[in-house]
């Protein structure tokens, strides 16, 4: 079903079965597959390809040569009906690629809302990107990566498969991330190592002075105390009982499979 208010350029191809919401815009030379859903007000600028079982929300801006929902690059993939879901108000810039999931990884690649994916960023199969994240130019997520809310990944940075990038993290450009990055941390290098707490970012997001002190204390326990990881986890858990901001660390430890960067 295509709403009557949708603009479709004469050179675009929208296949039968596609669902496009009110006031969407399908620009020149775009291709929209038969299983695609596009929400109200979303704009495909030009030369955008969206195919597979892909659902895109409202008011997104998708720029030329982006490819969304294409067959993933996992050699085990055998054409199973896997999906891509994208939320609302994202800006997906030129030549971004977002691949469909695999059955081994849950079958879904998911991007939340209010994100900025800059030129040539890549989101591989089974990745989850939260809300209000930034992937700078040429940032690359391998399969099964999780990027939590408000994270920023610098240009030319590559993230190893199955890694977690915690909430409010900033990863510097040209880095190689091979382990999980705890929330609030600045990471840089190849392999990426911790360089302190993302204090300026947290201030901009309204964290209290007390909360910032607690986060710094958790960081010091993890990286500067000389304690083993297990010892640091126990003390951080105690700190989290008094300071809710620190709970992000304990939740991160529960999810982490590759271990935190050191």
From Swiss-Prot:
<comment type="subunit">
    <text>Homotrimer.</text>
</comment>
<comment type="function">
    <text>Involved in the biosynthesis of lipid A, a phosphorylated glycolipid that anchors the lipopolysaccharide to the outer membrane of the cell.</text>
</comment>
<keyword id="KW-0441">Lipid A biosynthesis</keyword>
<dbReference type="InterPro" id="IPR037157">
    <property type="entry name" value="Acetyltransf_C_sf"/>
</dbReference>
<dbReference type="GO" id="GO:0009245">
    <property type="term" value="P:lipid A biosynthetic process"/>
</dbReference>
<keyword id="KW-0677">Repeat</keyword>
<dbReference type="Pfam" id="PF00132">
    <property type="entry name" value="Hexapep"/>
</dbReference>
<dbReference type="GO" id="GO:0008780">
    <property type="term" value="F:acyl-[acyl-carrier-protein]-UDP-N-acetylglucosamine O-acyltransferase activity"/>
</dbReference>
<comment type="pathway">
    <text>Glycolipid biosynthesis; lipid IV(A) biosynthesis; lipid IV(A) from (3R)-3-hydroxytetradecanoyl-[acyl-carrier-protein] and UDP-N-acetyl-alpha-D-glucosamine: step 1/6.</text>
</comment>
<dbReference type="Pfam" id="PF13720">
    <property type="entry name" value="Acetyltransf_11"/>
</dbReference>
<dbReference type="InterPro" id="IPR001451">
    <property type="entry name" value="Hexapep"/>
</dbReference>
<keyword id="KW-0963">Cytoplasm</keyword>
<keyword id="KW-0808">Transferase</keyword>
<protein>
    <recommendedName>
        <fullName>Acyl-[acyl-carrier-protein]--UDP-N-acetylglucosamine O-acyltransferase</fullName>
        <ecNumber>2.3.1.129</ecNumber>
    </recommendedName>
</protein>
<dbReference type="GO" id="GO:0005737">
    <property type="term" value="C:cytoplasm"/>
</dbReference>
<keyword id="KW-0443">Lipid metabolism</keyword>
<comment type="similarity">
    <text>Belongs to the transferase hexapeptide repeat family. LpxA subfamily.</text>
</comment>
<dbReference type="InterPro" id="IPR011004">
    <property type="entry name" value="Trimer_LpxA-like_sf"/>
</dbReference>
<dbReference type="InterPro" id="IPR018357">
    <property type="entry name" value="Hexapep_transf_CS"/>
</dbReference>
<keyword id="KW-0012">Acyltransferase</keyword>
<dbReference type="InterPro" id="IPR029098">
    <property type="entry name" value="Acetyltransf_C"/>
</dbReference>
<dbReference type="GO" id="GO:0016020">
    <property type="term" value="C:membrane"/>
</dbReference>
<dbReference type="InterPro" id="IPR010137">
    <property type="entry name" value="Lipid_A_LpxA"/>
</dbReference>
<keyword id="KW-0444">Lipid biosynthesis</keyword>
């Amino acid at each position: 079903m295509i709403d009557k208010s949708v603009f479709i350029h004469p050179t675009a191809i929208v296949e039968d079965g596609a669902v496009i919401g009110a006031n969407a815009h399908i620009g020149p030379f775009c291709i929209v597959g038969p299983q695609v859903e596009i929400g109200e007000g979303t704009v495909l600028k030009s030369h955008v390809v969206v195919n597979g079982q892909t659902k895109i929300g409202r008011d997104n801006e998708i720029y030329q040569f982006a490819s969304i929902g294409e067959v993933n690059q996992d050699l085990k993939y055998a054409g199973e009906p896997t999906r891509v879901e994208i939320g609302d108000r994202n800006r997906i810039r030129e030549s971004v690629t977002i691949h469909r999931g695999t059955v081994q990884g849950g079958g879904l690649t998911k991007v939340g809302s209010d994100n900025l994916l800059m030129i040539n960023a890549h989101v591989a199969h089974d990745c989850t990107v939260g809300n209000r994240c930034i992937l700078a130019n040429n940032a690359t997520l391998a399969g099964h990566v999780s990027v939590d809310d408000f994270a920023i990944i610098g240009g030319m940075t590559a993230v190893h498969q199955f890694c977690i990038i915690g909430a409010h993290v900033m990863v510097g450009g040209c880095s190689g991330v091979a382990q999980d990055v705890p929330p609030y941390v600045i990471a840089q290098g190849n392999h990426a190592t911790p360089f302190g707490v993302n204090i300026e970012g947290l201030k901009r997001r309204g964290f209290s002075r007390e909360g910032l002190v607690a986060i710094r204390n958790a960081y010091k326990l993890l990286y500067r105390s000389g304690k083993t990881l297990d010892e640091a986890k126990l003390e951080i858990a105690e700190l989290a009982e008094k300071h809710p901001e620190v709970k992000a660390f304990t939740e991160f430890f529960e999810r982490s499979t590759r271990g935190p960067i050191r």
